[in-house]
């Protein structure tokens, strides 16, 4: 993403996330909320709060009125509604991608879930 936040403890990244801005709109997309799986869970919780709150503040500072995100991670579903005042708007979302020039289609594992990777390998 063009804009983003990384939260560290003692110089070690704990979590990060990005923000895409819809140019000419008041709409932003928060994406790629990732964590260090080896980090202490309490540290991860605190850092995620800071990261997501910072992304929301970044969106506000850029004049955005809406921030949208999508995730299959149940822990993030709960976090978004409990700690970040987000509203669940869709429950059964499937994501789609079109490679416009053919340069990315050879390996889509970086953006695919395990089920889709298994389907590609059949």
What are these regions (language model features)?
Residues 28-85, 90-91:
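Acyl-donor binding region in acyl/amide transferases
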Residues 10-11, 38, 99-103:
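Short loop segments at secondary-structure junctions
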Residues 92-122:
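C-terminal "cap" of GNAT-fold acetyltransferases
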Residues 6, 70-72, 99:
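Histidine- and aromatic-rich ligand-binding microenvironments
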Residues 12, 53, 57, 61, ...:
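Polar/charged alpha-helical tracts
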Residues 1-10, 14-35:
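A conserved beta-strand-loop-helix scaffold within acyl/acetyltransferase catalytic domains
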């Amino acid at each position: 993403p063009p804009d983003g936040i990384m939260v560290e403890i003692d110089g070690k990244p704990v979590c990060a996330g990005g923000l895409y801005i819809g140019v000419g709109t008041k709409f932003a997309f928060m994406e790629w909320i990732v964590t260090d799986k080896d980090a202490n869970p309490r540290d991860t919780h605190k850092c995620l709060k800071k990261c997501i709150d910072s992304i929301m503040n970044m969106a506000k500072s850029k004049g955005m009125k809406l921030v949208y995100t999508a995730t299959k991670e149940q822990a993030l579903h709960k976090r978004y509604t409990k700690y970040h005042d987000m509203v669940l708007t869709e429950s059964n979302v499937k994501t789609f991608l079109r490679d416009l020039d053919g340069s990315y289609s050879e390996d889509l594992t970086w953006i695919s879930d395990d089920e889709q990777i298994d389907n590609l390998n059949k």
